[in-house]
């Protein structure tokens, strides 16, 4: 928890960092701790002030959908899933009943569909329709334990992971998406399953999802470990 004194110290640090950046001086390694403090402050503001588990992102009419969203470039050398029928989602960690779920099992669970605006950290946005199973329903099915505070999401691409706080993960608009724009989720957008929420920036939504783990400790992530904001809220 950040108290008032720490809040003021971080705010002052943010102003100093802005001045440093404006002067075009990187300060060497000495500035890094200050920048990390500012990043943590931004995460705190996003999570504790702007985010609410009851606040929903606005929805749009299907007619307002925009052109196809930009997507990952898929290299021919990338080990894509050759047999989608063999794909499974591993759910474990702080749950009473760890499970291995097929796509058919996920599609048989309660379904959420919405048309929302997707926001990328690079500055572009687009409107699309997504459908899938609420992550909260998967947590309930597996018996999430009260000690759980975070969720780690792993892609089939070894080493690519993401971490969310539990409140964001259990938000009613957080889904494990298997469909986009009235069609099955395409490979370029993370088929057969991806994490999706209109309350987060795009880099927080793990594609090609193969496992999720409920934890008591805050997990890192591929982009977050390189300096991107951990909370990543819109």
Language-model regions: role of each:
Residues 21-22:
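C-terminal motif of bacterial Sec signal peptides marking the signal peptidase cleavage site
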């Amino acid at each position: 928890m950040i108290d008032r004194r720490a809040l003021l110290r971080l705010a002052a640090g943010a102003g100093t960092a802005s001045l440093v950046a404006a002067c075009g001086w990187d300060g060497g390694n000495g500035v890094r701790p200050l920048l990390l403090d500012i990043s943590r402050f931004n995460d705190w503001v996003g999570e504790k002030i702007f985010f609410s588990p009851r606040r929903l992102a606005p929805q749009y009419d299907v007619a307002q959908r925009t052109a196809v969203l930009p997507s990952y470039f898929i290299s021919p050398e990338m080990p894509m899933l050759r047999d989608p029928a063999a794909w499974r989602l591993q759910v474990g960690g702080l749950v009473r009943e760890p499970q291995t779920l097929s796509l058919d099992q996920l599609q048989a669970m309660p379904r959420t569909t919405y048309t929302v605006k997707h926001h990328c950290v690079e500055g572009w946005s687009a409107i699309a329709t997504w459908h899938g199973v609420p992550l909260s329903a998967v947590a309930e099915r597996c018996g999430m334990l009260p000690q759980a505070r975070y969720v780690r999401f792993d892609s089939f691409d070894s080493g690519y992971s993401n971490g969310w706080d539990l409140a964001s993960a259990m938000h009613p608009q957080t889904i494990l998406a298997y469909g986009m724009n009235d069609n099955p989720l395409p490979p370029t957008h993370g088929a057969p399953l991806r994490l999706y929420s209109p309350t987060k920036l795009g880099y927080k939504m793990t594609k090609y999802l193969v496992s999720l783990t409920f934890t008591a400790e805050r997990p890192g992530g591929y982009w977050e470990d390189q300096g991107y904001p951990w909370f990543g809220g819109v």
